[in-house]
Amino acid sequence: MTVVAQKTALTGCLAPIDKNGLEQLIANGKANPKVVKTLKCKTVAEGKFRHANYIRNLPPYIVDEPPGLLGDDTAPNPSEASLAALGSCLAVGLHANAVHRGWTVSKLELELEGDLNITAVWGTGDVSEKPVGFTDVRVKVDMECEGIAPEEISALVAHVKKWSPVANTYTRPVNLEVGI
């Protein structure tokens, strides 16, 4: 199964981020490079496969499954939400790094797709030995910056991929504890 995240076109100059705030974040990170922040989310089942995810003081972030996976199709499924998190993290990194370099971003779009085998049906179906979860993820970045050559943007994309927290979660082992 291939999951494709829909794209939203943003054209013109992107709303600027606070360059002074960015510089302060950079200084804070350099001053205390070993700091670890714990992020939290509370997931509450609402019925069928629809779940409300409570993060900070924000409205709940809803995750559901499509009808083909017995859901009501009211929101992205968990795998799609994972792609959205990756795309958003990469986009934040691209925008922040462009601003840090003094670039003006006029266009930033990312198209993501990922391949996964869902025959295990969350452990209730075919549980023969095979990879579970995404086996391949592809991200296409369409970024334009005033006066910046495509080669420089490609180098920026590689840099951001290396330093993206969510991309690193995809590409390296993470300690995961699940219990009662």
Model-derived regions: residue spans:
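Extended beta-strand/beta-hairpin segments
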Residues: 1-84, 96-180
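Alpha-helical metal-binding/catalytic segments enriched in His/Glu/Asp
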Residues: 85-90
